[in-house]
Amino acid sequence: MDKNLLEAVKFDEKGLVCAIAQDAETKRILMVAWMNAEALQKTVETGFAHYYSRSRQKQWMKGEESGHTQKVRALRLDCDGDAIVMLIAQNGGIACHTGRESCFYKVWRGSAWETADAVLKDEKEIYGSTH
């Protein structure tokens, strides 16, 4: 592990840090996930976003099933060291497992959440079944 890479990062009690994927061109927030030290190291080594799945309890590379990989252009660490923003180039234009550009596709309209973004590709087409 690269000590310089990891020493400024404040991982939580579970060994995780919040990781935000932001489109390098449009600056749109695409998704929020978690990284452990190994996922962060793998991200730096490969140039592609790797995360840690809390539900599956394992590291994974974004796009390993869907092909919608995230090429990392830059990493930014916040002032407290407990959140990372990755400026990325999103392969295929789809970051969300629902087939949308962004996981942030719902907008509050005063009294209800409304879907604001269209599905670009059906989940069944991406994964073979619903994810």
From Swiss-Prot:
It holds the Pfam family PRA-CH. Its cofactor is Mg(2+); Zn(2+). Zn(2+) binds at residues 79, 96, 103. One of its GO terms (biological process) is L-histidine biosynthetic process. Pathway: Amino-acid biosynthesis; L-histidine biosynthesis; L-histidine from 5-phospho-alpha-D-ribose 1-diphosphate: step 3/9. It catalyses: 1-(5-phospho-beta-D-ribosyl)-5'-AMP + H2O = 1-(5-phospho-beta-D-ribosyl)-5-[(5-phospho-beta-D-ribosylamino)methylideneamino]imidazole-4-carboxamide. Its EC number is 3.5.4.19. GO terms for molecular function: magnesium ion binding; phosphoribosyl-AMP cyclohydrolase activity; zinc ion binding. Binds 1 Mg(2+) ion per subunit. One of its GO terms (cellular component) is cytoplasm. Gene3D superfamilies: Phosphoribosyl-AMP cyclohydrolase (3.10.20.810). Mg(2+) binds at residues 78, 80, 82. Keywords: Amino-acid biosynthesis, Cytoplasm, Histidine biosynthesis, Hydrolase, Magnesium, Metal-binding, Zinc. It is found in: Cytoplasm. InterPro entries: PRA-CH, PRib_AMP_CycHydrolase_dom, PRib_AMP_CycHydrolase_sf. Belongs to the PRA-CH family. Homodimer. Catalyzes the hydrolysis of the adenine ring of phosphoribosyl-AMP. This is Phosphoribosyl-AMP cyclohydrolase. The lineage of its organism: Bacteria, Pseudomonadati, Pseudomonadota, Betaproteobacteria, Neisseriales.
